Amino acid sequence: MGGNAVIGCHCHTCKSNIRLLDSTNSVKGLLETALEMNYKGLAITDHEVLSAHLEAIQTVRSMKKEGEMPQDFKLILGNEAYLVDSLEEVRDNYQPGKTKFPHFLMLAVDEKGHEQLRILSSKAWENSFYTGTMERVPTVKKDVEDLLKKDPGHIIATTACLGSEVNIYLQKIMEVEKNDGDPELIKEYKLKIHQFITWCIDVFGKDKFFIELQPALSEEQIYCNKKLVQIADGYGLKRIVTTDAHYLRPEDRAIHQAFLNAKDGEREVDSFYEACFVQNVDEIHERMNYIDKEIVEEAIQNTLLIGEMIEDYTIEHEPIIPKMELPNFKLRHLFKPAYDKYEYIRKMSESKDDQDRYLLKLIEDGFENKLLKNDLTRDEFHKILSRINVELGELWEISQKLNQSMASYYVTVREIINIIWDDECGGDSLVGAARGSAAGFLINYLLDNTQINPMQYDLPHWRHIHKSRPDCQS
């Protein structure tokens, strides 16, 4: 790798729009444009959301298979988090216009690193709260520190954009300098920057923490870039350059602006996102001509270095069916006289998996409470058992394919629904409506997952799930 090549280490897709309109890039469009700009790799770093990663993996694999992408193209999976000192500072002492949620970029080196990203992202969403209509999802430094110090070396971090902690304080210094302000205030801001940089070095290590420059033309970005060059030299850190792509190319800027203003017409977006597109090496050099060309070139080459540090891995895996801890139970074998006639009822009763047997126990209870009546005829009894047998057959065959018990899914859903209804959870919670196909499954009715007997309405079970196309909705 080298020459006129670069890796885009900071790029956004439309998945960044989960909380705030942000990017017009599709995963496929972003990758195609990166190739057109001679990129040797690309990082997906959406704003506190990892949901584009699987699509990116599958798209890259498909493009390589079809010969649309070089085999050595490097996909990097990352996250742009909102890194804060403490939850109390930003949530409990929030001040409109003053409280900051600094941006921070993290890239997974390997599968373990991606697991760490997922843990931190989940924690950020657990921390979520609203300021007006804006949902905040802060990542607390202590959580990053505690997690990564247990198993370091799996995540690369960068200082991110103008919205990052280091750049927020650099811009404060710029304002003080403009106004011939208090040198003690500048000293205070410099100390904040020092504390942030040393924290990053301590948590991520010098070799996995990079100073990020960006080729925007704003006064603030130019000032910060010049200072960031000095900071990198002062702490012995490597620099990279990123374009923080939120749209594909300059001709898409107007569309991106209209998209962002569609929800908030007063939001100023034009100058802020002026440079946030997929830029080639020549465009980067042209925009950063106020910095020595060798420094910019080295920063570009360091993006390729990051690519070399990233391992090839996938986050794909076979479906994992949720499984809850079961209470003590005893199967009554209510249907034992019919075991010979109904293969899958018998198989569930004899299963070595306690989830299978527990599901049958719940079916027994539901049958007794809901369907067993004094005037139940023999034909009606066998129609019910035949339906139960067919539905259990679907679950059994899928379980064999997955080597996991499908029964545990229904048992777990039942428990979740019971928790929602439980007075101990507040007593005022509602179970939301689903797509509807779950109502066609008699077992759901017997477990109280649904409240409609599908046999009364001739609802087919296969609309809900079939061994040829598993699909659970409840």
Q: Where is each model-derived feature located?
A:
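Alpha-helix C-terminal capping segments
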Residues: 36, 62, 419-425, 442-451
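Conserved phosphate/anionic-ligand binding catalytic regions in large, soluble enzymes, centered on
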Residues: 113, 240-249, 428-451
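Phosphate/diphosphate-binding loops
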Residues: 74-79, 85-87, 100-103, 240, ...
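Conserved short loop/turn motifs at secondary-structure junctions
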Residues: 44-50, 213-220, 247, 405, ...
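Generic recognition of stable, solvent-exposed alpha-helical segments in well-folded globular domains
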Residues: 29, 48-51, 55, 112, ...
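A glycine-rich phosphate-binding loop feature that marks nucleotide/adenosyl-phosphate handling sites
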Residues: 245-253, 304-306, 316-333, 437-446, ...
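Extended substrate/RNA-proximal surfaces in nucleic-acid metabolism proteins
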Residues: 2-41, 47-216, 223-235, 256, ...
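Non-catalytic structural connector segments
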Residues: 2-5, 166-169, 173-181, 186, ...
